[in-house]
Amino acid sequence: MSEYLFTSESVSEGHPDKVADQVSDAILDAILAQDPKARVAAETLVNTGLCVLAGEITTTAQVDYIKVARETIKRIGYNSSELGFDANGCAVGVYYDQQSPDIAQGVNEGEGIDLNQGAGDQGLMFGYACDETPTLMPFAIYYSHRLMQRQSELRKDGRLPWLRPDAKAQLTVVYDSETGKVKRIDTVVLSTQHDPSIAYEELKNAVIEHIIKPVLPSELLTDETKYLINPTGRFVIGGPQGDCGLTGRKIIVDTYGGAAPHGGGAFSGKDPSKVDRSAAYACRYVAKNIVAAGLATQCQIQVSYAIGVAEPTSISIDTFGTGKISEEKLIALVREHFDLRPKGIVQMLDLLRPIYSKSAAYGHFGREEPEFTWERTDKAAALRAAAGL
């Protein structure tokens, strides 16, 4: 029987790029809490002893950006110079400008050529869902995120006190070529930052027994499963001391782990007028509801926009041969049941709220948090009825 392999990865909240994402989204949330109509594009750079805040922000909110950045870094766990990055001791520079008026007139409702709220930029976005996991996410990315959440949990509650914030996980999964179903887990790679005092064998055994095995489905772990734990043998220097971190560099981790295409636009630090973020969330909402409705077991949707124009310039759907109705009919249902104009998306998903910090680590999709409206399946019944199933 033929098989194929597929791999996805996740990173922890202490990974330098994720530190940057979380600072950017914490600043976005602090602004939206006071000014829901703010225009925010908050970028962050973190390096040894340094946090740089830059980008474009137009708002009436009064926010202590330096305080927000320090509190976020401290919450992640970088609270000591021994870790190479200290929330209280690092220098924080603030270099924000305002949104370009040329862009603003295309986004502000009633201005520009299109009197509806136009898209904040041109671009293409994808959404995806499949029936491999309970939250309709691909297997490898879903469980890679769960491994990283487990690492954080054991670090913060003190059960494995030698863990440090920076970590990465990677899963290679074996699929049956005929059924397309997961057969077993081939390889688990998990690298975690640690105190210098811990012996390698003790670390390896603890990671396998306390992080990996409680998370991954036991029936998919076999005698052939390979465990690669801190493969270099040592991971003491990490976080922003080990690598420079930037907002928006983990876009595949943030989405579907490579199981679906990506339009290229990052999420964190962007208010919902930026379709890079809001339309990608809407695409996930559409795809998840199509799969939840039983109209397909796998669904990928692409939408595209032009700056300053409200209506999408294209909508396309691929169900990879699993659809119960044609893709043309699915597109018609999407147009009928989902408003994919920027303002329609914001209203449909209630996005003008300070809900984004939680999304900045462990994936934007496949987590059924109460704030994550794009994970609801409240349109599934209507879609199924409209399809005549």
Curated annotation (Swiss-Prot):
Catalyzes the formation of S-adenosylmethionine (AdoMet) from methionine and ATP. The overall synthetic reaction is composed of two sequential steps, AdoMet formation and the subsequent tripolyphosphate hydrolysis which occurs prior to release of AdoMet from the enzyme. Its EC number is 2.5.1.6. This is S-adenosylmethionine synthase. It catalyses: L-methionine + ATP + H2O = S-adenosyl-L-methionine + phosphate + diphosphate. Belongs to the AdoMet synthase family. Mg(2+) binds at residue 17. It is an enzyme of class 2 (transferase). K(+) binds at residue 43. One of its GO terms (biological process) is one-carbon metabolic process.
